[in-house]
Amino acid sequence: MRIRVSYLLVLCFTLIWFRWTVVYSSFSDLDALLKLKESMKGAKAKHHALEDWKFSTSLSAHCSFSGVTCDQNLRVVALNVTLVPLFGHLPPEIGLLEKLENLTISMNNLTDQLPSDLASLTSLKVLNISHNLFSGQFPGNITVGMTELEALDAYDNSFSGPLPEEIVKLEKLKYLHLAGNYFSGTIPESYSEFQSLEFLGLNANSLTGRVPESLAKLKTLKELHLGYSNAYEGGIPPAFGSMENLRLLEMANCNLTGEIPPSLGNLTKLHSLFVQMNNLTGTIPPELSSMMSLMSLDLSINDLTGEIPESFSKLKNLTLMNFFQNKFRGSLPSFIGDLPNLETLQVWENNFSFVLPHNLGGNGRFLYFDVTKNHLTGLIPPDLCKSGRLKTFIITDNFFRGPIPKGIGECRSLTKIRVANNFLDGPVPPGVFQLPSVTITELSNNRLNGELPSVISGESLGTLTLSNNLFTGKIPAAMKNLRALQSLSLDANEFIGEIPGGVFEIPMLTKVNISGNNLTGPIPTTITHRASLTAVDLSRNNLAGEVPKGMKNLMDLSILNLSRNEISGPVPDEIRFMTSLTTLDLSSNNFTGTVPTGGQFLVFNYDKTFAGNPNLCFPHRASCPSVLYDSLRKTRAKTARVRAIVIGIALATAVLLVAVTVHVVRKRRLHRAQAWKLTAFQRLEIKAEDVVECLKEENIIGKGGAGIVYRGSMPNGTDVAIKRLVGQGSGRNDYGFRAEIETLGKIRHRNIMRLLGYVSNKDTNLLLYEYMPNGSLGEWLHGAKGGHLRWEMRYKIAVEAARGLCYMHHDCSPLIIHRDVKSNNILLDADFEAHVADFGLAKFLYDPGASQSMSSIAGSYGYIAPEYAYTLKVDEKSDVYSFGVVLLELIIGRKPVGEFGDGVDIVGWVNKTMSELSQPSDTALVLAVVDPRLSGYPLTSVIHMFNIAMMCVKEMGPARPTMREVVHMLTNPPQSNTSTQDLINL
C-alpha cells in the first residue's frame, strides 16, 4: 500500500514538473518573441509590422503568431519572417528559442552584427538571413554546435573580412550561399573539405587570389557560383572537369585569364556555363560538345577567337548562346538553325561573315536574335519568327540585302526591330507599322522604298526611325495613332505633300526630324500645342508660309532647324522667351523685316542663324539691303537722267553713312567706359572696358539657356569667366538684380565658384567669376576625357560638390536653393577641386522683381525632381534629387537622358535594370551599371556612393536625405580594405 502511494506521489510530482516545464518554456518563448519584435521592428517599420505578436496569458498564444510554428510542446521550432519589412537588429534573445530548427528572416532591412547567442540554436537545420544589412565579420564560431545545419543563406548582406572556415566542419551542410557581401581575401583551401555540399555561392564579393583547384574534390557539388566582382588571378582550373555532378558553373566577371580548359567537356551533367565578362583568350574547345546536357552557354565579352566548332551540332539541348563582343570569325554554322531548343542567339560585335543559315528560327522557339556589328551578308532568313514568340530582331551594321521578310510584319510578339545600316531594299511589310508590342523600329540607312501604309498603329512604339532611305508618297495622317511615340525620324527620304497636323498631336512626342524631303505647304499650327518637344528639324524641304504664332509655348525646345525652305514673314519676336532654345537655324529662307533683339536672341550667332535671307534686316547695321534694293529696282523704270541722279544720291548717301558709322563707332569706343559700370566684390585690378573687350565670338566657351560664357584674359594676366545673362533684365537700373547679385557676391566657400563682381549698362549684365581651367564635370564624364577620370577623383569631386551644396542649404546667409544642379554646373579648377557654379540665378534671370518665386526655373532636363511636375515648386530636396543624378553620372559615366531610349532617364534605367536582375543585390546592380571605362576601382566605395545616390533620387522629397546628411555619408564610407586586393579590374 505504501509503495502504491509513493508511486502515485512520484507520478503526480513528475506531471506537475512537466506541466511547469511546459508552462515555463512556453512563456520563455513568448517573452523571446516579444523581445525579437521590439528589437527587429526598428523606428522605420510600419505600424502593422508583426502587429499580431502580442502578450497573452494563453500558453499557446505565441504559436499563432504570423511566421511562427510550434511543436507539440508549444516550443517554437520555425520562425519565418520574410518581407515584413523590419529595420532593427537581431537581439541576443534569439538564443532563447533553443528548439528552433528553421530561422528565416530574409528580405528585411536588419542591421548590425549577428549576435553570438545564435550559437545556442543547436537544433537549427535552416539559417536564412539573406537580403538584409548585417555587417561585420561573419561569426563562424556560432555554427560550431549547429551539427544539424543543412542550409546557410547569408546572401546579399554587408559582411566583410575573410570567409568563415568553421562551417567546413558541418557534415550535413548542403547549401552555402555567402554571395553578395564584401568578403575579401582568398577562398580557403579548406572549402574543399565539405562532405555533403551541393550548392556553393561565393560570387559578388571582393575575393582575390587563385581559385583553388582543390574545390574539384567537392564531388557532391551541383552548383558553383564564383564570379561577379571577385578579381581572381589566373584562369578556370582544369581540375573542375572532374566535378561529375556539377549542373551549373558560374565564373562571370571575375578577371579570369587564359583559355577555356578542354577538360570541362567531361561535365556531362552541366546545364549552364557562365564565363562571360572576363579576359579569356583562345578558341572554343571542341571538347565542350560532350556536355550533352548543356542548355545555357554564355561566353560573351571576352577575347575569344576562331570559329564555332562544328561538333556543337551535338548540343541539342542548347537554349541560349551568348557569344557577343568577342573576336569570333567565319560563318555561323548551318547546324545552328537545326538546334531544336535554341531560343536566344546573340553574337553581336564579332567578325562573323557570309550568310545566315536559311533555316534559322525554323525550330519554332526563337525569342532573342541579335547579330549587330558583324560582316554578315545575303538575305534575312524568312522563319525567324516562326515561333510567334520572337521579341528582339536586331541586325544593325551588317551587309544584308534584299527585303525585310513578310513574317517580321506578322510577328506580334516583337518588342524591338533594328535593321539600320545595311543594304536592304524593297517595300517594308505593312504589318511592321502595326505591331502592338514594338517599342523601337529602326530602319534607317538602307535602300527601302515605297509608300508608308495608310493604316498605322502601335500602342507601345516609342521610337520610329526611317532616315536615309527611298520612301516616297505622303506622310500618313495615321501617324497620329502612335500615342506612345517620342522620337520620329523621317529625314533624308523623298516624302511629298504637307506635314500632317496630326503628327504634332502625338501626346508624348519630343523629337521630330523630317528634314531632307520634298515637303510643301505650311508648318502645321499644331506644333505650338506640343509643349513636350525638345528638338524639331524641318530643314531642306519646300515649306512655305510663316512660322506659326505661339512658338513660345514650346518651353522645352532646345533645337529648331527650319533652314533651306521657302518660309516667309517676320522672324517671330516671341522666340526671345524660349529660354531652352540654344540652337536655331532659319538660314536660306525668305524671312523679311528686322531680326528681333534681346532675350534668347543673344544666344544665337546672327551671321549663321539668319544667313541666306536676302530680305531680312539685321539690327544695329547702317542699312537694310532689301530696302535699298527695292528703291534701286523702282528707279530703273525712270529715265537715264533720273537714274543717274538717284545713283549719285545713293553713292553720296552711302559715303555719308560710312562717315557717320565711323564717327559713331569711334564715339562709342570713346565713351565705352562711361556706358559700362564695374561693381567688384573684392579687389580687382581690371576695368569695365577690359571685360567688354572680351565679348567676342572667339572667346565663347559655353552657351546655355541662361546666357553665353566667355573667357576673358585681363591686362594684368588673370583670367575670368564672363557670363552674359539672357533674359528680361534691365541692367544696372534693376535694383532687385543688384540686391540679389550683391548677396551672392558675399558667399565665400572653397567649393562654391566665387562671384568676383559684375559689369552692367542699361541693357546688359555681365557676371564675373573665377575661371576654371579644367572645365565642367560633365565635359570630363561625357567627353573624350571621361575614361581618364579615375574613381578616386570622381569620389573626391562628389564630396567637394556636396560640401558646396551643403553650405548653400545649411550655413549660408541667406540660405540658397541652387535649382539647377547638374554635372555641367560643377566646375573644376587647376587642381581638379570641384566648385558649384550657377547657383541662385534662376529666380531672377527671367522675372525681375519676383525673386521670391520658387518655381521660375525647375532645372535641366534629366535632373528635375519628379514632384515638380505637379507642384511647380522646388526646394532644397529638389537640389538633393539633382545631386543624386550627378552621383549616378559619376558611377555610370552616362548622361542623364538620351542614352537609355526615348522617355527613359538615368534613374528610370537603373530601376529597370534592377528589376531585370535574376538575383537583385546592390553588388549585382552596381556591376551591371558601372562605367565600363573605369578600371581598378574599390567595389565597396562604388556601392556606398550608389546607395547614397539612390537615397537622393527617391520619388518623394521628404524621404531624401539633407545635403548635410549626404556629406556625412560620403565622408564616412564603410570601413574596408582598399588595397589592390579590393579592386575590381574589368
Swiss-Prot record:
Sites where a glycan is attached: 80, 102, 109, 128, 141, 255, 266, 279, 317, 351, 513, 518, 561, 590
Documented EC number(s): 2.7.11.1
Family affiliation: Belongs to the protein kinase superfamily. Ser/Thr protein kinase family.
N-terminal signal peptide: 1-25
GO terms (BP aspect): cell differentiation
Keyword terms, alphabetized: ATP-binding, Cell membrane, Differentiation, Glycoprotein, Growth regulation, Kinase, Leucine-rich repeat, Membrane, Nucleotide-binding, Receptor, Repeat, Serine/threonine-protein kinase, Signal, Transferase, Transmembrane, Transmembrane helix
Residues at the active site: 820
Subcellular location: Cell membrane
InterPro entries per the UniProt record, alphabetical: Kinase-like_dom_sf, Leu-rich_rpt, Leu-rich_rpt_typical-subtyp, LRR_dom_sf, LRR_N_plant-typ, Plant_LRR-RLKs, Prot_kinase_dom, Ser/Thr_kinase_AS
Tissue note: Expressed in roots, leaves, stems and flowers.
Described purpose of this protein according to its UniProt entry: LRR receptor kinase involved in the regulation of root and shoot growth, and root nodule organogenesis. Involved in long distance nodulation signaling events. Involved in the autoregulation of nodulation (AON), a long distance systemic signaling from root to shoot and back again, which allows legumes to limit the number of root nodules formed based on available nitrogen and previous rhizobial colonization. Acts from shoot to root to control AON. Involved in the regulation of root colonization by arbuscular mycorrhizal (AM) fungi.
Topology term for the membrane: Single-pass type I membrane protein
Phenotype upon gene inactivation: Increased number of root nodules when inoculated with Mesorhizobium loti. Inhibition of shoot and root growth. Increase in arbuscular mycorrhizal (AM) fungus colonization intensity in roots (enhanced mycorrhizal phenotype) when inoculated with AM fungi.
Protein name (Swiss-Prot/TrEMBL): Leucine-rich repeat receptor-like kinase protein HAR1
Coiled-coil stretches: none
Consequence recorded when altering residue 740 to K: In har1-5; increased number of root nodules when inoculated with Mesorhizobium loti; inhibition of shoot and root growth; increase in arbuscular mycorrhizal (AM) fungus colonization intensity in roots (enhanced mycorrhizal phenotype) when inoculated with AM fungi
Limits of the Protein kinase domain: 695-971
LRR repeats: 71-97, 98-121, 123-145, 146-170, 171-196, 198-218, 243-267, 268-291, 293-314, 316-339, 340-363, 365-387, 388-411, 412-435, 437-458, 459-482, 483-506, 508-530, 531-554, 555-578, 579-603
Superkingdom as given in the UniProt entry: Eukaryota
Record field: catalytic activity: L-seryl-[protein] + ATP = O-phospho-L-seryl-[protein] + ADP + H(+); L-threonyl-[protein] + ATP = O-phospho-L-threonyl-[protein] + ADP + H(+)
Gene: HAR1
Binding-site list for ATP: 701-709, 723
Transmembrane regions listed in the UniProt entry: 645-665
One annotated Gene Ontology cellular component of this protein: plasma membrane
GO molecular function, one term: protein serine kinase activity
